[in-house]
């Protein structure tokens, strides 16, 4: 018996009046994930398009793969590089991850396999916990509301896992995604009704609730007892000269062979996925362009002003682009169609606001050397107001033409 025949055979148990009626959302989620939904439009459609919500979300999910696979390799590479330089640290490692890695691979930074297995041992448990715990909340709320479970959580789960440091405790991952899904999305009605990005909401919760595991120099490398600063932290301490003197070139930062959150280090891998999203019109090119313009404008202004006490005033825009979470946030977070502005003019304003805010937070606020998360969440809060003024201005303009 094939999968399709099996699903058809048990379907009546999950329909209204069936033995497992309350679990219909779970059955429907599995059915629509594996196969195209059987529902069709019976009357004339107002809009005809070749892409639906399922295809859109799966496309976004697939577009994260370049950043995800590179992130796993880089997580392992950074750890194995430290082991090669400090054998005493390798001898001091212990725990289930270390035992698992030792059973399937070695610790050679020049080995693609060793690096990938090392990184996978950290990323895959984070992703699994995110998917299981977040999926539980999605199914629970869908069952209570008698709604379907849509594919939006595929995107939320992978985005959240990719913006975390590899060393984060798994119980904090579960707590963070629970907050993001329940408080950031479900209490507002679920997919399509949230005004904050759920993945960023989850990360913000962890950032403020457990700062020791989300920031600092000890969380970015999967090696117990080692502390390594990110390029942005080095820039904050001594400017671009400090970054370069530490051995990090602009190309290193662009390719992604640096410390950082699992999926945020490689601007190149992120742009590969972003090109597909923009080309398929899933991501708004207006928002992406607006973010770049806002960032370039303010960073250039700070370069011209200069500062003797703040070295980040001198950071050029092309360095802002490749360090921290700027590229990942611009491509995958700012373009979220639910929490971003919906009007064309509003998308420009929304994007520019993010670009300006991220540089402002990075350069002027000494408490947060990284500002992309807060910049996007702030813009999410402003998005309804931006659209309101754009729509009102359009109404006034059209009325004026008819006077």
From Swiss-Prot:
Membrane topology note: Multi-pass membrane protein
Broad class of the protein's primary localization: membrane
Record's keyword terms, sorted: Cell inner membrane, Cell membrane, Flavoprotein, FMN, Ion transport, Membrane, NAD, Phosphoprotein, Sodium, Sodium transport, Translocase, Transmembrane, Transmembrane helix, Transport, Ubiquinone
HAMAP family according to UniProt: NqrB
Subunit structure: Composed of six subunits; NqrA, NqrB, NqrC, NqrD, NqrE and NqrF.
Alphabetical list of NCBIfam families matching this protein: nqrB (TIGR01937), PRK05349.1 (NF003756)
Recorded family membership: Belongs to the NqrB/RnfD family.
Name of the protein this chain belongs to: Na(+)-translocating NADH-quinone reductase subunit B
Taxonomic classification: Bacteria, Pseudomonadati, Pseudomonadota, Gammaproteobacteria, Pseudomonadales
